[in-house]
């Protein structure tokens, strides 16, 4: 669980366990962060996995959710910051890319309204 936090080297070690010890390894985790960038461990896992089963989530609009949006206490989408925040108070919402992009644009437009 939380395989996105593994290092690429740890993923390589898991692959060695599968190949050398003939032990099946199952990993679960996110592909991308709140900025839609791959986690390094997730990228390596996808490169080496024998199979990948996607667990789908749904955006509030009904489309397939593909973005893990980080939000603050006021419900605003956070677009900058560290990829991993330990002990952070931020929350996350699964959104489709369209809704995520529209919400960011809406927030940007509000900055220019006086």
Language-model features: where?
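Gly/Thr-rich phosphate-binding loop signature of adenosyl cofactor/nucleotide-binding cores
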Residues: 1
């Amino acid at each position: 669980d939380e395989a996105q936090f593994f290092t690429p080297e740890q993923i390589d070690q898991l692959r060695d366990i599968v190949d050398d010890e003939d032990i099946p390894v199952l990993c679960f985790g996110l592909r991308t962060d709140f900025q839609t960038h791959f986690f390094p461990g997730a990228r390596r896992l996808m490169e080496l996995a024998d199979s990948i089963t996607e667990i789908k989530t749904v955006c509030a609009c009904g489309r397939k959710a593909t973005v893990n949006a980080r939000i603050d206490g006021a419900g605003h989408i956070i677009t900058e910051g560290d990829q991993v925040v330990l002990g952070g108070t931020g929350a996350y919402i699964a959104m489709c890319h369209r809704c995520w992009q529209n919400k960011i644009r809406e927030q940007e437009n509000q900055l220019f309204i006086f």
